[in-house]
């Protein structure tokens, strides 16, 4: 994976990490993460697929696949603690 792609993925993780820190008991919507990470939904969805495949993020899509929620997995949370604290 090249550095540009990795930097983009870390940006999504950081945005999700910040959202989770601010609202720990509330699931993060795709719309909120798209806004916080400053990515169009189509780009965000592709990047989330890579993060899900890595085991760092869990994604739950609503019927139709347009809306949903995303959260850090245990390993994603551990990675976030290492990178962002």
Where are these regions (language model features)?
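Short acidic, hydrophobic short linear motifs in intrinsically disordered regions
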Residues: 22-35
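Short amphipathic alpha-helical interaction segments
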Residues: 6, 38-53
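Minor-groove-contacting beta-hairpin "wing" of winged helix-turn-helix DNA-binding domains
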Residues: 64-72
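Short, locally clustered residues in the helix-turn-helix/winged-helix DNA-binding domain
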Residues: 14-21, 84
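Short alpha-helical segments that sit at the start of domains
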Residues: 1-16
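Short, amphipathic alpha-helical interaction segments positioned at domain boundaries
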Residues: 74-85
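A short, conserved structural fragment
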Residues: 52-64
């Amino acid at each position: 994976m090249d550095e540009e792609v990795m930097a983009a993925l870390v940006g999504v993780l950081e945005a999700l990490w910040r959202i989770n820190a601010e609202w720990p008991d509330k699931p993060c919507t795709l719309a909120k993460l798209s806004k916080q990470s400053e990515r169009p939904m189509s780009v965000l969805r592709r990047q989330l697929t890579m993060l899900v495949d890595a085991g760092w993020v869990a994604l739950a899509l609503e019927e139709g696949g347009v809306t949903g929620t995303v959260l850090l997995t245990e390993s994603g949370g551990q990675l976030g603690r290492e990178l962002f604290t």
